[in-house]
Every structure is written in structure tokens, then in C-alpha cells.
Amino acid sequence: MVNRLLDKIINEGYDISYDEAVRLIDEDIDKVLQGAKKLRKVFCGKHVDLCSIINAKCGKCSEDCKFCAQSIFYNTNIKTHPLCSYDEILKLAKENELEGVHRYSLVTSGRGISGKEFEDILNIYKKLKEDTKIKLCASLGIISKYQLKKLKEAGVSRYHHNLETSREFYSKICTTHSYDERIQTIKNAKGVGLDVCSGGIIGLGESFIDRINLAFELKNLKIRSIPINILMPIGGTPLENQRKLNNEEILKTIAIFKFINPKADIRLAGGRGSLENYGEEAFLSGVSATITGNYLTTQGNGIKNDIKLLNKLGLTV
């Protein structure tokens, strides 16, 4: 089955069906991983897109996402801080640019950004556009089409907004805003001409079918950058005792996402540390992009280490 699907996807531009994706769950894992590797090679080549983030505003979030350390609903003892200064944001941007990172994103806690805070962020992006050559991304929550247009005018080229999980499982993860609000934000971003980065988190307690449903939702939205985060349970959150996924289940999930979205960059994101060798095998199983450096509330592998790893695998940045 795997070889037949590969031939049709590569040579005929075939989109696999939902039933075919479900059947991949029970296929031999080595065949599925090798198939995803071939799809990455055909559609994305050897290049790996590197992006980095700064936790530009941390904590005191009004939303109740059950995996998140920054929600006001949970006692996680994280250090909160208001919007970082421009000097802090510029320093990290320049460091990342010098180390070879392609994209840099401000990430802010909260449902969304408005008022003076949004104006401050616009000014930050305008200055970054002048002071660096790195591509600029933004992850500011649920915001309006007007705000997205202003971000684009300020120099942002890509907006990040995860769906997190399937529509069917979503209510078990978040109740303070809807799945449709997330989808509308994505549509608004695309509507003003921004590229969109959107994916989710695996290991929340969802089924493999939920992951496939998410992958098809992203396909229908024509997302070309799909970050896959792996839950790292955080003390104080409702998911602090959630079972961790094993290496094989994570890799097979990533590979099936690639079969469903062959032309998209599957981006290895938060939780890489739960994979052997920081996801070395994932880069040979469909992944063609990664967040490098540190994440929002957890540590990463380091930019130099990531580039060294990718070069060892014969990949380029």
C-alpha cells in the first residue's frame, strides 16, 4: 500500500483519501517512515527551514488551554513578564540571524493583543525590518483582519496560529475560545496575504484518528508550514500526569502528516527533547523544518547543535 501511494502522490499529484490515511496507522512503521522520507526528498529537497522564537510576553493568559503553563487557571510557578524591550528582542534576533536561522517570531501570551500593546509590537516589527534581514513571523493569538494587515505592512511575512488538535477533541483541551475562532484567524491572515504556519500538539490524550483529522483540517486550509509539538507535561496543568508518547508513535504521526500534506514543511517544534537524539530520526522521516533554540517555557537543543545534527544527516540550512 505504501509504495502504491508514494507512486501516485509523486507521479500523479494524488491526494490520499481519509481512509487511506487511517490505514497507514497499521502499516509497518519502517515502510511508512521511509515513504515520508522520500516525500520530503521529492517535495522539499535537503533544505531544512530553521525558525526561532522569543517569549515576548509571558504568563497571565486569560485562556484555559489545559497543556499551557501560562494560563491564569493553573499554578505552574512560571516567571511572568510584560512585553520585552526592543533591545532584548533585537539582540536575540541578531544572534539568531548570525547563527543561520531563517525566521524569527515574537510570541505573546493571552487571547490576543490590542491597544497600545499592539502599537508597540507594530513599532518593534518596523524596527526589526530595518535592523535585520531575518524573515519576520508573529504569533499573537486571535486578532482581527485589520491587525493582520497592519502586521504585514510592518514587515511580518508569516502568521503562526495553531489549531492544536482535531475539532472533535478540542473541547477537552480549551473552552474559553472556539475552534472556529482559530480557523477564522487563519483565514484572515491568508486573506491579507500573509503566509500561515499552523499545526498542533500531540500527546494530549487524543487518538490517532484525532491527529489524522487535524492533518486533513490543515490540508483543507492549504497550510504549507505545519509545526508538530510533542506534549511535555508541565506540573500544575491539568495534563501534568499525561502519558508520554513513545518514539515510534511520534515518528509515525509525523510521517502520516507528511503523506497527507506532502508539499508542506512538517516542522518539528516543542517537545523535541522527548525524541531520541532531539529528533534525529524525524529528519529522516518527513520533517523539513524545525524550531531551533529554546521554546516558550521549555529548553531546546541549541542552534549550533541543531545545525551540526542536520549537517551530519546530509541536510542543509
Swiss-Prot record:
Residues forming the Radical SAM core domain are 43-272
Positions contributing to [4Fe-4S] cluster binding: 61, 65, 68
Q: Which Pfam families match?
A: BATS, Radical_SAM
CDD domains xref list: Radical_SAM (cd01335)
Pathway listed: Cofactor biosynthesis; biotin biosynthesis; biotin from 7,8-diaminononanoate: step 2/2
Enzyme class label: transferase
Q: Which reaction is recorded as catalysed by this protein?
A: (4R,5S)-dethiobiotin + (sulfur carrier)-SH + 2 reduced [2Fe-2S]-[ferredoxin] + 2 S-adenosyl-L-methionine = (sulfur carrier)-H + biotin + 2 5'-deoxyadenosine + 2 L-methionine + 2 oxidized [2Fe-2S]-[ferredoxin]
SMART domains on file: BATS, Elp3
Gene3D superfamilies this protein is in? Aldolase class I
Query: What is annotated about its quaternary structure and interactions?
Result: Homodimer.
Sequence similarity: Belongs to the radical SAM superfamily. Biotin synthase family.
HAMAP family, per database record: BioB
Q: State the protein's name.
A: Biotin synthase
Q: Which organism is it from?
A: Clostridium novyi (strain NT)
The primary gene name is bioB
